[in-house]
Regions:
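Gly/Ser/Thr-rich active-site loops/lids in small-molecule metabolic enzymes
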Residues: 178-188, 229-259
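Short Gly/Thr/Asp-enriched flexible loops that form oxyanion-binding sites at enzyme active sites
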Residues: 93-106
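Catalytic core of DAGKc-family lipid kinases
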Residues: 33, 43, 64, 103-107, ...
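Glycine-rich phosphate/pyrophosphate-binding beta-alpha loops
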Residues: 163, 167, 223-242, 311
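ATP/nucleoside-binding phosphotransfer catalytic cores, i.e., glycine-rich phosphate-binding loops
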Residues: 2-7, 16-19, 212-214, 240-248, ...
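ATP/NTP phosphate-donor binding region
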Residues: 1-85, 95, 134
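Glycine-rich beta-strand-to-loop/alpha-helix junction loops that act as flexible
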Residues: 36, 88-90, 111-114
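Short N-terminal binding/cap micro-motifs at the start of the first secondary-structure element
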Residues: 39-43, 231, 327-329
Length: 331
């Protein structure tokens, strides 16, 4: 059990009766890493989830205490031989867990606790916590880990997407108001996107140069994806780049050349549409089947960078690569 605290096997007074917990012959060891500050996580839900999963798994649970803590916990869990680590939080918690488990035999699973839960949805995990917990319980009888790729930017792994420019500036603004992010979810992201564009990208935004193989593109925003979609607006997938899947062994990207007040509404409509394609817009170029991408400032101004919806700071250069089959997952 190491330094992790064994969850107490007691039924909460309001535990839902529809969690069916039967005892298998041998329980797998599970570490649940909980982000107590995630948008939809509470002490009550934490205890209910732990109680339910104890029926099929030998459960330890630990809360994260600071940025990067989940990465440390996952490295230790892999070293101690846990059969699975469950990240209970948002995409930032999942990202840290993936960075800690990369290259190890210990698989990662997710329980939705954030505002978007993009990677969990990409893996096919139900968006509702009760359904996701029952899904995880059912997997105890059908345990089939599989390997997925990880993208890398400046040494930091990401599970689904990363970006520089407008995309990252929106993430920076949203992260600065966590209470509104938790309360308003995708609607706060939409407001932040419009207001950030008007304040920082309508006039003279920072320019960047994107180099992928023999192609060099100039733009004001670049996104790089390890899979599709780029994100979700509630349950609606937002498609930007094309061609990447979690096990394709390659990345996909898109470059926005100019962010004009005429072009941006049409690009936004294409992103939300189930039929139109963002890459068909004349201000957007796509990058497909790429293994390495370098994005650098073209005018000396630093570029905001995000990975999996977490703001990583401003950089002069971002180097992207792919780690094929680097992460074990169960879903």
């Amino acid at each position: 059990m190491g330094v992790f605290t064994r969850a107490q096997n007691r039924r909460p007074s309001d535990a839902p009766v529809h969690f069916q917990a039967t005892s298998p012959r041998a329980k797998r060891r599970m570490l649940i890493i909980v982000n107590p500050y995630a948008a939809t996580v509470s002490d009550r839900l934490r205890h209910l989830v732990v109680y339910a999963l104890q029926g099929r798994f030998e459960v330890d649970a630990v809360d994260t205490e600071a940025r990067g803590h989940a990465t440390e916990l996952c490295r230790q869990a892999a070293h101690e031989g846990y059969d699975v680590v469950v990240a209970f939080g948002g995409d930032g918690t999942v990202n840290e867990a993936a960075n800690g488990l990369r290259g190890s035999a210990t698989p990662l699973c997710c329980l939705p606790g954030g505002s978007a839960n993009v990677f969990a949805k990409m893996l096919g995990i139900p968006a509702e916590l009760v359904d996701a917990t029952e899904h995880l319980l059912a997997m105890a009888d059908d345990w089939r880990p599989r390997k997925v790729d990880l993208g890398v930017v400046n040494g930091r792994c990401f599970t689904f997407s990363s970006g520089l420019g407008l995309d990252a500036s929106v993430v920076e603004r949203v992260d600065s108001r966590p209470s509104l992010k938790a309360r308003l979810g995708p609607y706060f992201f939409a407001w932040a996107a419009v207001s950030t564009f008007l304040r920082r990208y309508l006039v003279s935004p920072a320019r960047m140069e994107v180099q992928a193989g023999e192609r060099t593109l100039l733009g004001v925003t670049a996104v790089v994806q390890n899979g599709s979609p780029f994100t979700y607006f509630q349950d609606r997938p937002i498609e930007i780049a094309e061609g990447a899947t979690l096990d394709s062994g390659a990345l996909a990207g898109a470059v926005l050349h100019r962010a004009t007040p005429v072009a941006m509404p049409f690009i936004g409509w294409r992103a939300l549409s189930r039929h139109a394609r963002v890459l068909r817009h004349r201000q957007v170029s796509g990058l497909m089947d790429i293994r390495e991408v370098t994005v650098r400032t073209a005018d000396g101004r630093p570029l905001p960078l995000q990975a999996d919806g977490d703001y990583l700071g401003d950089v002069a250069e971002a180097r992207y690569s792919i780690l094929p089959r680097a992460l074990n997952v169960v879903a």
